Amino acid sequence: MGDTRAHALLVQMLGAKKTLEIGVFTGYSSLSVALALPPDGKIVACDVSEDWTNVARRYWKEAGVEHKIDLHLAPAVETLSQLLADGEAGTFDFAFLDADKDNYDTYYELLLPLLRPGGTIAIDNVLWSGRVIDPEVKDADTVALKELNQKLHHDERISLSMLPIADGLTLAVKR
């Protein structure tokens, strides 16, 4: 979780007010982002686990940021699709993706139109403990990450940087 300070710094550098998080778990990343947001900042947080997000809610409340976080307990594809249907395209400043790896590409394609130009998607675990460079590793998560890394490298819609922070953090900035 060493990259949460990077998330907070990115949010501040972007002047972000409206953010997305795909994959909440215990809320560590969303807490870091919420603390970095201005008083009127918001996070739309997506997760499917009520058990883990209950832990997150306790931390958010204790830190006094629960009012900044709109938790959606539903598959992220549904939430992101609904945001697009509701006319939210181009209105988000920052998104953090750390969820089921085999759906990263689907999430990416739904997140990108939600971002404003200059908005940034931070994608976690892109190095996957080095497995993404091992041609012998062919499990679904590793293959999905390898394919996404290649796709992002060639995607003309973004500017790209892969940072060796924690387990690899890709920054995709919408052009």
Question: How would you name each of these model-derived features?
Answer:
Residues M1-R175:
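S-adenosylmethionine/decaboxylated-SAM
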